[in-house]
Amino acid sequence: MKKNRQWKKWIPIYILGLPGILYLLINNYMPLYGLLIAFKDYNYSLGVWKSPFVGFQNFEYLFKTKDAWVITRNTIGYNLLFILLNTVIGVALAIFLNEVRKKVSKKIYQTAILLPYLMSMVVVSYLAYIFLGDRTGMINHLLTSLGLPPVKFYMTKTYWPLILTFVNEWRNIGYGTIIFLASIVGISESYYEAAELDGATKWQQIKLITVPLLKPTVIMLVTLSMGNIFRSDFGLFYQVPRNQGMLFSVTNTIDTYVYRALLQSGDISLSSAAAFYQSAVCFITIIIFNNIIKKYSKENALF
Amino acid sequence: MKKWKRVLSVVMMLIMALTMVTGCSSKKSDEDPAKNVTDDKTATDNGEEPYELVIEVVNISQSFADIEAVQEAINEITVPEINCTVKLMTVPIFEQGTRLSMMVAGNEKIDLVNTGLLTSPSTLVGEGLLADITEYITPTMKELAGDLLAAGTFDGKVYSYPAILYPGTVACLFYDKDLAEQYGIEVPEAISKSEDWENILKQVKDSGMSAYGISLGDGGGASIMEFGANLDGLGDNNTLSYGVVVDPEENTTITNWYESEDFAQLCNDHYDWMQKGYCVPDSLTNGYTTIDSMANGECFAVTSSNSVGMSQAYLSNLTGKNLEMVMVREALLTTGYVNTQSWGVASNSENPEKAVQFLDLLFQNAELANLMNYGIEGSHYAKVDGTQNIVAFPEGKDASTVGYGGDIISWFGDTKTAFQRTPNTDEFFDTIDDYGLEGAKKSLCLGFTFDTSKVATQVAAVQSVVGEYKPTLTTGNVNPDEVIPEFIKALKDAGIDEVIKENQSQLDAWLKTK
């Protein structure tokens, strides 16, 4: 009886929440129905429901070729590397920035490292080309003026893991740094004052105060990136290597593979299958990662 | 009192929630006010309301200021003739690939659409986007299109109608006439063998001019020498991954082009030229098209696969050079070429019959075609003095300032009777028959379309392999002796043999019914 009344008490609150709930339902849950397309031979005039069901046939092209292993390895490998570097370099830069005392220079540095993040990947790809071009590239100009043979970057795959990592860090590091910096700024000054009174060095302060207090932010950002481990930055892997076939074994990721394979036919069922596969893997990864976090540091787990 | 307050709050919440929900769905009713206006004005004698035909006009990106005036002028022809009004819907080319599917999925009103510009009619049919128009095709239309009609026929039903009745495509070389005279370079009348190419390129190199002989492009799409080899790609002229028919006017055996000696020869030649410095060295990555390279003076010649509109005059204007054409391969008609631009009726059209009637009228009434292509004479175009059928922008207007038609990509009507824009000249109409059924060579497979649905996985995989290996090979950047065997093996692993086998069996079945 009591329980019942409590339920009734919350009705106005639920109604207040209704628009939001409806929004979530319409925007985030109803489209889930579209997942069906991945298992159908989609036909616009028949619609989603009536199109013939084909089971897992749409997924075959993702696994059937020798590329399956390469694209999986590249996607996950690059992502793990990027997550690691983004975190380490981001935290380091944030700490450095925090130590800059002059307001003007701090703002200048902050803007400078964030600026590349605002650039389109197409622009970035041309910037890279200015450095790496065969005939017109700056690096090759330098090499030839030193009497060294020029390097055909766009045909030599050994350089590309390094180039892609560099470009990715150069472009994205500013964004992570800003988030870390925001949490560092939030750390109370009194910890540092107390530490200074006790005679702690700068390094000790960083190691024993800043980093431990940054841990929740780091864990959250890493968990979120884990949720994207099977997706890749299409611009980075397609535009920056200029779609060069010779480089595919180190630049081909699941997104670029799907794009190239379906460019001609534009088949909506096959592309949905790829997206479904990516989402499924990401979902599993994020659940596993979250459980690991739960085990070691329960209060920092996302859910 | 307190209770009332609660009830009141609940009611308020409900109202708020409701308005939010209904706010999303009140879009449809006020969509086309134009419809009502035109309907009032044009009710005709037989009492039947004229049907409003929505026609997709693909352009680059402009929105035409005078589109309604043009619509009215068109209606003056169409209402008495076939009792319909038109509504022109401009669609920028970058949206065209997705617009039709969005409109059909959302059941928005659309009738006549461009097919083939970005997506082939067969793909659109497979996705259920086109209506079956077999029964509406008039005898005149049948006669005009002749064998070309087969290209838009799938499983015995007509789904698309060729927009250009002279769709033959030639392979040719354009070279800079001024440079050739200045440096005394002799270019033969026609090119057929690899020695001919070598001969020209060597002369260019030895002449000491600052330009390279030619640019091999970025390897996307088929290279010119492949067109020169007289191939029918059976619906995939880009990656040639369905297998090809060589000399299709007398042969119907599908082979793997990448295994052929001709392909190896081509790659060897290109590699050789690259080594000798005949070609732009970084064409693979520099982001310029071959036409760009020609325009900026980087090369002496440019290869091109030309349809009827892409004349010498047109390309000269585009590159700003005085170009001369050399034939590499005479015009060929294949399903793929016919389907590069055609008309279809959207599967959700309420009146496909009317849409086809309009097409029928369009191909017979040059006045209507000119209206659709160029707008109203005087305000949107002007006849060029001393020509029969050539038009230009009116005085003081150009492509970006004219009120209609500045950047239209769609083509309306019969190419032979409608006007052409400058820089084409009246000569255009003399050569036109070379590109049509009368003058062009006809592939035996004209009308056949490969249904890839049974081997969709293999096709996707093969296309991905072609994308990986082909560009560097055909642009002469890698040694073919090392890479071709690897390429062939990757193709076989991807299942090209299954694709070709399926394609051949479909082709044989199709040939029997012919």
State where each predicted segment sits.
Chain B
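Extracytoplasmic/periplasmic substrate-binding proteins
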Residues: S122-T123, G221-D247, N268-A399
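Helix-loop-helix "hinge/cap" segment bordering the ligand-binding cleft or interdomain interface
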Residues: K157-E226, V244-T285, S347-K354, L361, ...
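Conserved small-residue motifs centered on glycine
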Residues: Q357-P471, T475-N477
